[in-house]
């Protein structure tokens, strides 16, 4: 087996991942899957900004990244959060290497809108060769969502979009958004499979709402590229039974589901 899975773990769930989740990751790697992880860190960035009394503001739900905010974000993402994740993987006998999107110029970006958002990037190019080399040697690259411009200016990037871009560049078989819910629920029931059009309808109907909307939108963005399938899974429980994955699968067309 030679399949690739990219996990995206949000900052709010990283410290709540279950032992079962890590055991599943180890089992997938042992079964021959090549794995990569992209993580966020929003809550911990907020906490550190408050501790250091660095002023911040949000524009359209997105943190405006001034230079002082960028320095804290890089410290937290590449330092605290990234190395915590690497340590937790090591505790579960999983070899990983913590990097950011700056390493190997993996994520090349331009300013999204410097006047409005500050040092926030929009990804223009992905160079996954360094991460793929690690995966070939059975290391899991744990990637913090930071990027650089062609002039080597550091920019913060949205972790969901970073994961989608990395998965597309790697032509991953699956992109998994690891959350604290089982997947997409409708009337309290887990939806096993949702097509692109069904997902858009569920958003319009308000069934997909709140923080799930950007994840589903990122999933749809990934599907428009080279990713075959996106899943929303629960990192607080089991995501893999040994034969099947647990969660909601988002696919282009149901006819394509095997």
Curated annotation (Swiss-Prot):
Pathway entry = Amino-acid biosynthesis; L-arginine biosynthesis; N(2)-acetyl-L-ornithine from L-glutamate: step 2/4
CDD domains to which the protein is assigned, alphabetical: AAK_NAGK-like (cd04238)
Q: Output one GO BP term.
A: arginine biosynthetic process via ornithine
Q: What is the protein's name according to its record?
A: Acetylglutamate kinase
Catalytic activity line of the entry = N-acetyl-L-glutamate + ATP = N-acetyl-L-glutamyl 5-phosphate + ADP
InterPro entries cross-referenced by the UniProt entry: AceGlu_kinase-like_sf (IPR036393), AcgluKinase_fam (IPR004662), ArgB (IPR037528), Asp/Glu/Uridylate_kinase (IPR001048)
Q: Where in the cell is it found?
A: Cytoplasm
Q: Which cellular component appears as one GO term in the record?
A: cytoplasm
The record's annotation in Pfam families points to: AA_kinase
Q: Name one GO molecular function term.
A: acetylglutamate kinase activity
Name the principal localization, coarsely classed. cytoplasm
Source species, please? Bacillus pumilus (strain SAFR-032)
Signal sequence annotation: none
- Which keywords appear in this protein's UniProt record, sorted alphabetically? Amino-acid biosynthesis, Arginine biosynthesis, ATP-binding, Cytoplasm, Kinase, Nucleotide-binding, Transferase
**Family label:** Belongs to the acetylglutamate kinase family. ArgB subfamily.
User: What is the gene called?
Assistant: argB
Q: Does the keyword GTP-binding apply?
A: no
Q: Where is this site: Transition state stabilizer?
A: 8, 215
Does Amino-acid biosynthesis appear among the keywords? Answer: yes
Sum up the protein's function in the record's words.
Answer: Catalyzes the ATP-dependent phosphorylation of N-acetyl-L-glutamate.
Write the Enzyme Commission number(s) for this entry. Answer: 2.7.2.8
- The residues listed in the UniProt record as binding substrate, with positions renumbered to this chain, are 41-42, 63, 156
